[in-house]
Amino acid sequence: MDYKNLVAERIKENTELEVDLIEKLIEIPPKKEMGDYAFPCFQLAKTFRKAPNLIAEELKEKINKEGFEKVVTVGPYLNFFVDKTILIKDVLEKVLSEKEKYGSSKVGEGKNVVVEYSSPNIAKPFHIGHLFTTAIGNALYKILSFEGYNCIGINHLGDWGTQFGKLISAYRRWVDEEALEKDAIGELLRIYVKFHEEAEKDPELEKEARLNFKRLEEGSEEETELWNRFKDLSLKEFNKVYDMLGIKFDSLAGESFYSDKMDAVVQEIDDKGLLVDSNGAKVVMLDEYNMPPCMIKKSDGATIYATRDLAAAIYRKKTYDFHKCIYVVGTPQALHFKQVFTTLKLMGHDWADDCKHVGFGLVKLANKKLSTRNGDVVFLEDLLNQSVEETLKIINEKNPNLKNKEDVAKKLGIGAVVFTYLKNNRERDIVFDWKEILSFDGETGPYVEYSYARGKSILRKAGELTGEADYSKLSSKEEFELAKLLGGFNDAIMNAIDKLEPAMVTRYIIEVAKAFNKFYNAHGILNAEDNDVKLARVKLVEATCQVIKNALNLLGIDVVEEM
């Protein structure tokens, strides 16, 4: 039973408000002893022409209380206490019947959502900052898909621009082919850095690089062959990380894909009378929106990111007819996306309102114990490998005889890192601290994983239990609070979709793990006072494990069955 919906239906019977609006107004009381749901009666003051306190009292007398233990007033609020026995039975039966589908819905059926995320630059390090966009985008993709949306995951590769002219010059002069085969990104980065050092002494190198890129734009066979090699080598390295994270994309259409589509966009902007000359550059003026101009073409005629993003948005709308187009890109790019979306609106594309920028913070290291390949950039692959190694050390200390401990360390280590990136509001910076990330105490991935493994251990020991569970035996505060939390899984998911914030699911699952451990510590399960209580509690454990597994899967994290 959806109690929030039931509260809304009961209020609707006695007011003129619609259920959808009532559900949005319903709150969770700040203290558990105040009830399970609260409805603020302020919204009804105009209609009823009474003070909210009096309206609450009046509704309390009229409302159908079936399914609730009691309904009380707290000032202007109408507070509902659910019938604990009915709630526990409803929630556990629903979880155990729907299993891996529990928490899902068809709310997004028939709606396409484009999610652009990860988007590393070709020939540049796939560093620890990239995991923010990668983890958030992957989680949003999974969460939206779980609720019925048809998602298109796009890795908008940074595979075009004048930097490739520089890289071609650097490759021809200084590449070490042996080093390139061993560590492609490291070698490409080395020669790219060397190009900039040498260009300071010899400005002719910059001219040569521009000529190289011009040839690439014109389709020169030699330059195109080198560009493809850089791309193939980079993707081979990137795919190692994506394989570790279990991530696949529906499209790898990066910046180069739109190189032949930008002239049409520039022409469309010009045809609308929006293109203005500014010191030789072509811009769209956005003064009335309190924004600087959106540059479309530089003074040398080259297009820039904004032009490519405009072309990409128009192409995606034509190709996917999206309900939403989500850009998971760092918060510093907020102004850029405001300019792009506003320019789209000025071009007459009202669907620009369906384009959403999902920003995120920075990643900082608590100490310098993380090794780097070139002294300043921390490669993501190295970070994930180090997390697995550190986790294996912990397992060897705590449970050296654990079966498949390398596999467990891999799942736990990688999952711990992803969990850290998704734990807090995405716009907050992350301070990376191994001690905290890999701790089995506190609000961490390993803590949640350990809670799941503890539950699975109980289920293995319980074996096959026969008979129908009598959920009225679950009468304690800890049992009710846990079951009630399990019933709120879909609410957490819908909040994550509404705010485009995976942390809503992460925070939820931390609360579930805490509630489960409180229940575990307060009550005997396998040694319960009788078989009826034992069966009911085992079913509660089974439902908890199912919800934790479903939630972690939405975050892109594998569960560990034993540790």
Curated annotation (Swiss-Prot):
Look up the domain of life of the source: Bacteria
Molecular-function annotations in GO: arginine-tRNA ligase activity; ATP binding
Which reaction(s) does the protein catalyse, per the Swiss-Prot or TrEMBL entry? tRNA(Arg) + L-arginine + ATP = L-arginyl-tRNA(Arg) + AMP + diphosphate
Provide the E.C. number(s) assigned to this enzyme.
Answer: 6.1.1.19
Q: What class of enzyme is it?
A: ligase
NCBIfam families recorded for this chain? argS (TIGR00456)
Give the quaternary structure: Monomer.
Q: What is this protein called?
A: Arginine--tRNA ligase
What lineage is on file? Bacteria, Bacillati, Bacillota, Clostridia, Eubacteriales
What gene name is listed for this protein? argS
